[in-house]
């Protein structure tokens, strides 16, 4: 039997370097990267790098040998090789100026088919929905790009079309659940087929060119190439699940015979689809008014009343109310407000929305409409205002959705300082410090207590302002009471201090009564049995003693905790010691962050309180000066 040699089995044969993979596949580095991105193959980190690299200590990029064997059977490899042949032959035709043959070759340009790869990577529709977060975020980003060297115009236009189609599904299904505004953009979370899908829509800023060292647009473009095919499949399935025509179409009532439709119907339809403000054509009219619920309430009622079932019922009822949050409300968006994110939010929750017709196509009513309930503005003032509507800032819409109720609009009026905008994506179980506003977001019953604490602060400020007046009144009252007491004492001495009864006689009468009572008690005790006598004797022995105050020494308690912690650290096994230190370091970092946040919050509250006091004093001072001026004028 032959003795096995070193590195012929085990971990050394499970991995292969990138250079060896390129030789085996006979591809260039760029083609290999493209193939790995499309197939979902990525580098691996071995457990023992020296063994995996057959004794070499050099840092190499390693792949699973099984993944490389998997790539050998991919049909795209032949298409990538055809690209190389096409480049050589077209370059030769261009060099000899054989443009006729070059035109023929360009018509036969090899194309990569990715349909089978999408089906291979996502066997079920739920698998595709689970991987939809990165897909949507990247496509929304590329939909805002202009035509670049590595990003053709057709790719950006395709990303824009697919993302608009997906937003139409979100609006029609009313599946939006959470929203948030940040520096990166607008965060959206929808619940589709029981899966939570989260994506980011970037802010609409002018495009700033990036250097090649910062962003590799070529690699990102390969991801987009795969994700466009994937999202096309997903949109097709989602639209047919709601009986919506795909590609999106409008009912005949929208396509009226006017000048715009007669000139160019395709551009008219595409503009209205991009406006996100019209209902789409349904293939089945019976399903138009029916809305599918994610949870079957009748099935839940049959399952009993366990805690889990009750929680699911409550969640289903909250979602049903949330889907009609803005029902019956009409919004008008001003020019300075971002149009598309607010249209998605308002229409996803049952509201009606419009804007200035000169900004974008698809406006359904004007600003002068008297039935408008809310106008969304982002400026300090307006020249003309209507009494029948509320002028609010855009944050009101986001906060109402996150708290699942219509909030009062007084804090969001035009020109007002907005309350803090809290993220609904924070996990309260993992975070150590939770501000009071966020607690109120997760538990609406805490809003009243938070408001009550603010009122208590105002009351304490008012008490501090009126403290001097109360002290003066108390001094006057004490002087009056002292004078009354002196008068009563003088009258008591004047009339002899008695009511005609001698004190010695009263004391003798009291002593006789006490002796009679003691004799009666002794007679009663003699008549009782021995057990009762014993109980009475024990009761007489019981007495109340003065207690002692035990002072808590915090330093000793802290020292005991530190000693216990050191004992636990010594008991940790040596192989787990690094992990233990890492956990302790993370815990200390969290505690420090919590302490800093609490300190920062205390400073902010103190500054706000001081500013409030200063404003009150200035207001009182101004009122006093105005009153003095009025007296002088009088």
Swiss-Prot record:
Domain BRCT: 321-414
The UniProt record lists the keyword Repeat: no
Keywords, ordered alphabetically: Coiled coil, Nucleus, Phosphoprotein, Ribosome biogenesis, rRNA processing
Modification Phosphoserine, positions: 453
Segments of skewed composition (Low complexity): 624-634
Family matches, as PROSITE patterns: BRCT (PS50172)
Gene3D superfamilies the record matches: BRCT domain
Compartment(s) of residence: Nucleus, Nucleolus; Nucleus, Nucleoplasm
Cited CDD domains: BRCT_pescadillo_like
Coiled-coil stretches noted in the UniProt entry, renumbered to this chain: 460-546, 596-629
SUPFAM superfamilies: BRCT domain
Record GO terms (molecular function): ribonucleoprotein complex binding; RNA binding
Superkingdom of this protein's organism: Eukaryota
Pfam families registered for this protein in UniProt: BRCT_2, Pescadillo_N
Ranges annotated as biased composition (Basic and acidic residues): 528-548, 603-623
Region (Disordered): 437-473, 491-561, 603-634
Gene Ontology CC terms, in alphabetical order: nucleolus; nucleoplasm; PeBoW complex; preribosome, large subunit precursor
Compositionally biased residues, Acidic residues: 454-473, 501-527
GO BP annotations listed: maturation of 5.8S rRNA from tricistronic rRNA transcript (SSU-rRNA, 5.8S rRNA, LSU-rRNA); maturation of LSU-rRNA from tricistronic rRNA transcript (SSU-rRNA, 5.8S rRNA, LSU-rRNA)
Homology family: Belongs to the pescadillo family.
Role played: Required for maturation of ribosomal RNAs and formation of the large ribosomal subunit.
PANTHER family: PESCADILLO - RELATED, PESCADILLO HOMOLOG
Protein name: Pescadillo homolog
Organism of provenance: Drosophila willistoni (Fruit fly)
């Amino acid at each position: 039997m032959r003795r096995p040699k070193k590195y012929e089995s085990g971990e050394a044969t499970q991995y292969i370097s990138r250079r060896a993979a390129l030789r085996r596949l006979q591809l260039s580095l760029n083609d290999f990267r493209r193939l790995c991105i499309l197939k979902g193959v990525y580098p691996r980190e071995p457990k023992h790098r020296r063994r995996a690299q057959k004794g070499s200590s050099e840092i190499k990029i390693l792949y699973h040998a099984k993944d490389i064997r998997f790539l050998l059977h991919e049909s795209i490899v032949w298409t990538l090789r055809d690209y190389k042949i096409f480049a050589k032959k077209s370059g030769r035709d261009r060099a000899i100026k054989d443009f006729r043959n070059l035109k023929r070759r360009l018509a036969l340009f090899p194309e990569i088919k990715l349909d089978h790869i999408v089906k291979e990577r996502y066997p079920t529709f739920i698998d595709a929905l689970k991987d939809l977060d990165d897909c949507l975020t990247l496509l929304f980003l590329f939909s805002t790009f202009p035509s670049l060297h590595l990003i053709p115009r057709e790719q950006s236009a395709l990303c824009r079309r697919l993302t608009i189609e997906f937003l139409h599904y979100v609006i029609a299904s009313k599946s939006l659940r959470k929203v948030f505004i940040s520096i990166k953009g607008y965060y959206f979370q929808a619940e589709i087929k029981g899966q939570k899908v989260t994506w980011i829509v970037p802010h609409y800023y002018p495009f700033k060119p990036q250097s090649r060292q910062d962003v590799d647009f070529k690699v990102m473009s390969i991801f987009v190439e795969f994700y466009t095919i994937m999202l096309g499949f997903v949109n097709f399935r989602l639209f047919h699940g709601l009986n919506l025509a795909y590609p999106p179409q409008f009912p005949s009532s929208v396509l009226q015979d006017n000048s715009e439709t007669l000139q160019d119907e395709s551009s008219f339809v595409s503009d209205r689809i991009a406006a996100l403000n019209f209902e789409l054509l349904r293939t089945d009219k019976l399903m138009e008014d029916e809305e599918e619920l994610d949870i079957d309430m009748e099935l839940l009622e049959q399952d009993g009343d366990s805690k889990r079932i009750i929680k699911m019922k409550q969640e289903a009822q909250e979602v049903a109310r949330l889907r009609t949050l803005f029902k019956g409300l009409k919004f008008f968006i001003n020019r300075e407000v971002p149009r598309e994110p607010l249209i998605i939010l308002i229409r996803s929750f049952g509201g009606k929305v419009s804007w200035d017709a000169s900004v974008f196509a698809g406006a359904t009513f004007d600003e002068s409409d008297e039935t408008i309930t809310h106008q969304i503005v982002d400026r300090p003032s307006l020249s003309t205002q209507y009494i029948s509507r509320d002028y609010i800032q855009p944050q009101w819409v986001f906060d109402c959705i996150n708290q699942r109720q219509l909030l009062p609009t007084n804090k969001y009026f035009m020109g007002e300082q907005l309350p803090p905008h809290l993220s609904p994506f924070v996990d309260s179980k993992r975070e150590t410090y939770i501000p009071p506003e966020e607690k109120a977001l997760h538990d609406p019953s805490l809003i009243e207590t938070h408001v009550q604490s603010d009122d208590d602060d105002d009351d304490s400020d008012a008490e501090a302002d009126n403290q001097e007046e109360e002290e003066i009144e108390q001094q006057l009252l004490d002087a009056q009471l002292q004078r009354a007491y002196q008068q009563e004492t003088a009258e008591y001495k004047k009339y002899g201090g008695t009511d005609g009864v001698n004190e010695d006689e009263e004391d003798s009468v009291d002593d006789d009564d006490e002796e009679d009572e003691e004799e009666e008690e002794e007679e009663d005790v003699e008549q009782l049995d021995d057990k009762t006598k014993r109980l009475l004797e024990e009761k007489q022995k019981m007495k109340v003693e003065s207690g002692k105050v035990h002072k808590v020494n915090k330093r000793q308690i802290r020292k005991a905790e530190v000693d216990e912690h050191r004992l636990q650290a010594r008991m940790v096994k040596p192989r787990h010691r690094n992990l233990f230190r890492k956990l302790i370091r993370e815990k200390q970092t969290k505690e420090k962050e919590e302490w800093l946040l609490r300190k920062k919050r205390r400073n902010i509250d103190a500054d706000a309180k001081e500013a409030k006091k200063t404003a009150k004093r200035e207001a009182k001072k101004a009122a006093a000066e105005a009153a003095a001026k009025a007296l002088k004028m009088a």
